């Protein structure tokens, strides 16, 4: 079997196309119960029934997350927040409610369909202190030192140049600013299998959220390299083979192209984890 890792621009185009299509179906990237089921119960598990019930109909089904970075961030009134890969806008809208009229939230996404849905959702929710910008998280369209808190939900795994994305996050944060991320993370590594790590990642496909996932050690190293301190990475949920299969539904490749012993060895490696860090300063 032949494997070849796609180029950075090819990966980004695949991600754009995949999520432009997925926004129509409301399917997600990952969840504590797997990604193949009903989106509303999944989001209730992540955010709580009261939070979800307070949102306009349809907002919840445009979520593609694997956690609740808004709660993780412990947002305060008046803070300026940036949501990296804001998708349909769920986390950005919840953050806007938390920071109040004295705060503001920016959402950045590179997919036009997502931006259109997010803006409609903001209008339906009557939230004015939020703005959705077209952009790449490897080149954030904001000046340096303007953001109090960065949140992101199951997105950093999708970007080809994670080092650049984290350097950009560090750049736009104010001194003392916080990073609060939910993401797919590998606990351990993908070595020791009868195929190479590159072959495993290529077979799983980038758009399924797991092919581009970092290991815990890799994530920590890149955060340190970018300048972050007070780094904490915590496993919240370990994905089963059924979970991973559901996450890969509708994308090329998948578990069926890997040897069975590799598939069994992957059980528990892929996790939904929280990542917090801080930019040194005030």
Stretches found by the model and what they are:
Residues 188-210, 246:
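Short, glycine-/aromatic-enriched active-site segment of Class I SAM-dependent methyltransferases
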Residues 81, 150-151:
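Hydrophobic beta-strand segment of the Class I
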Residues 163-178:
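A short glycine-rich, Lys/Arg-flanked "PGG" loop and its adjoining helix->strand segment in the class I
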Residues 61, 68, 76-139:
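Class I SAM-dependent methyltransferase SAM/SAH-binding core
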Residues 99-100, 159-160, 173-175:
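Helix-to-beta-strand junctions that scaffold the AdoMet/dcAdoMet cofactor pocket
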Residues 211-227:
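Short alpha-helix
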Residues 2-44:
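N-terminal auxiliary segments of SAM/dcSAM-dependent transferases
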Residues 222-282:
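C-terminal lobe and adjacent flexible extensions of AdoMet/dcAdoMet transferase-like proteins
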